[in-house]
Amino acid sequence: MEYGEEPSIKRFLMLPDDLVFNCLARVSRLHYPTLSLVSKKFRFLLASKELYQTRILLGGTESCLYVCVRLHTDSEQLHWFIIYQGPNSSKKVLVPISSPNFTSAALPGFVVVGHEIYAIGGGSENKNASINATGSKTYNALSSVMVMDSRSHTWREAPSMRVARVFPSACTLDGRIYVTGGCENLNSMNWMEIFDTKTQTWEFLQIPSEEVCKGSEYLSISYQRTVYVGSREKDVTYKMHKGKWRGADICLNHGWSLDPSSCCVIENVFYRCSLGDVRWYDLKKREWAALKGLEGLPTFTNYYRNFKSADHCGKLAISWEEYVLVDDETKIWCAEIAIQKRQNGEIWGTLEWFDNVFISSGPNRHVDLLVNALTATVW
């Protein structure tokens, strides 16, 4: 036993291992970050495979909301957090967890497959190169893929992509990861590649038209059991249909092409969050409709920015930044909205909670801290 442990903790750890695991498996994983601070023994137990095997046997699955942040003090390092609510508090906060030991000035593409979070590609700033003709920085693209096991919050390296990609777009469908764009000289052979998470192998998805891949920056999402890809430059969206690409609903394209991480799909309904409101896509009317019933949710003013959304147990989880000019600080807010489909075809939302979960002080006005918000299902 470690020096200074409470007698009650000592007595608990003296129990047979199978009984200890049985007890810990019944505790919500949201409390694990706090429990891991008790002692090294607790940290070992909470990270052990035996604990997760016990949780599987007990049928204990949870969906946890993860937030990735890039701090102004170290803008190339990605920091990962989990949203946590203490046992004696109603306030929710971001609790830091293990972050991968690599830097990326250009953001990777992020996806979730089961209990694993993938960070795909990205790039380091090319400090030896001059600013390009558009006034933008240039980057050294990466082909690497990092994966976090959300059961233990440990990172591993997955097989690299065949092509290095900077600011790639990624989405998942049926356990396969579709990665689009992010490299120079795109053509019908390298425009998109697919990672099979079961076989851990990459393959290119050839497309029939060079016209589709003339852009450089793409956005993608899985919706209606297929993959949608939008091009910023061409202002057009394509969808895959029976192995072929064709133009998608133009109304859909105009609604989501600003930022794919501000959009999510919940029970086959497309939602997006932006300055002003939360909207869902009405397939019958082929238009975006405001999500009604959000009493209590603050009005999104010009000081709110960088919206992210995720499906959290069938509820809409929203994260955003607020810059507070008088204090020269940036706050990260999170909210959770319950969704209700009504008989007349309308969709309403009920705000369950919203909270200021993180504050960063310093010259952040022109720096986006919030990188992404993702939900992973774990045992």
UniProtKB/Swiss-Prot annotation:
SUPFAM superfamilies with a match to the protein in the record: F-box domain (SSF81383), Kelch motif (SSF117281)
What domain of life is recorded for the organism? Eukaryota
Which key words are in the record?
Kelch repeat, Repeat
Pfam family for this entry, one: Kelch_FKB95
In what residue span(s) does the F-box domain sit? Answer: 9-55
Q: What InterPro entries is this protein classified in? A: F-box-like_dom_sf, F-box/kelch-repeat_ARATH, F-box_dom, Kelch-typ_b-propeller, Kelch_1
Positions of Kelch repeats: 116-175, 176-222, 262-308
**What is this protein's name?**
F-box/kelch-repeat protein At4g33900
- Species per Swiss-Prot/TrEMBL record: Arabidopsis thaliana
